[in-house]
Amino acid sequence: SAASDVYKRQDYSKLLNNKAKKKTLVSLYDPQTKERWEEVVLPISNGELNNLLYTRWVKQRAADVDKWSNGRLGYVHIQSMGDPSFRSVYSDILGKYNDREGIVIDTRFNGGGRLHEDIEILFSGEKYLTQVTRGREACDMPSRRWNKPSIMLQCEANYSNAHGTPWVYKHQQIGRLVGMPVPGTMTTVSWETLQDPTLVFGTPITGYRLSDGSYLENTQLEPDVKVANSPETVVKGEDTQLRTAVQELLKEIDKK
C-alpha cells in the first residue's frame, strides 16, 4: 500500500488499522540528532494487546505481593472459571510458590465458568503425611493440593461462578474473603446462538439451592474484610484491596 506521512499532533494509531500480523515499514526521525532510520514492525490486534495488558497486570500484582510479604506469600489470579486458568493456578502454587507460607487467590473481574469444586478441593488440603527419603523430608502429603493458609480477593465485577467460587471458599471455611460485595449471580446459563450469529442469548436455567431452601441467585456475598479500590489510588497503580489481603493473611499466619 502507499506510504502515509505522520504530521505533528496527528494520532498515528489509525494508520495501523487492519494491519495486524502484517509486516509494516516505519520510518522514524529524531529531531535532536536529525537522524532518520527505518524499522519493520508487526502490528498486533486489540485482543493481543489486551492479553499483554492482562499479563502485565498479573505480574505487577505478583511482584507487589512478593515485596509486601518479603517473599512469604504467593499470588495467583483466576482469569476465568475454566481449565486453562485452573492449570495456571495449579502450576504456580505447586511450582514456584510451593515453599511459600500462604497464597493470595485473586478472583476479581472473573466472568465465571465452572470451577468452584476444583478450587475448593485444591485449597482445602490438610497435611496427613510427610515423605522422608534417607532422613530428608521430601514433601508433604497431600502433595497435589495446597495445605497451607490462603485468602481470596473478590470485587463488584465478579460474575456467575465467580460469585459461587468465593461463596464455596467461605462456606467451607477454607479462608476469608477480602474486597467488595459480589452480586448474587451464581446460576447455570444456557447460551443459544440465533440464526443471526451475532445474536447470542444467555438464559439462566439452573439455580443453586441451600439446605434452608434459599438460592445463591440474588443473594449478595459479603466479604469478611470490606475494602474498596478508589479511583484516586488506582490511577497511581496502588491496589488497596491486594495490600489489605496480604496484611490480613500475614496476621493470620503469624498467629499460628
Label the predicted regions:
Residues 97-101, 221-228:
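Short acidic (Asp/Glu) and glycine-rich catalytic loops that position anionic groups and cofactors
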Residues 5-198, 233-241, 247-255:
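Cleft-lining beta-strand/loop regions that shape enzyme active-site pockets
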Residues 63, 158-160, 195-226:
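Metal-dependent DNA phosphodiester-chemistry modules and their immediately adjacent helices/loops
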Residues 1:
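Glycine-rich active-site/cofactor-binding loop and its immediate structural neighborhood
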